Amino acid sequence: YVILVYDIVTDDAGKKILPNVFKICKKYLTHIQHSVFEGNISTPKITALKNELKQFIRKDVDSVILFSSRDERWLKKEFIGLNDDKTSRFI
């Protein structure tokens, strides 16, 4: 189980990078809030995700953080403010 967050500087180059990073993350994980994704993902898919992201992330200004856990049940999800527990995979 992984939680991924990213921060892309929105300069001219970043505005072009941001949609690509979003699409890559959405391909592997569930979009839960702005630049936050979560989901169960295998080790080979984590490797593929990271390799795809490395093509776009500028090491000097952008960042991606992956939090990993063996199981989602080991995490407590708590909302402060809007409790929008919908995932983007549901229509």
At which residue positions do the language-model features occur?
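Basic nucleic-acid-binding interfaces
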Residues: Y1-I3, I8-I91
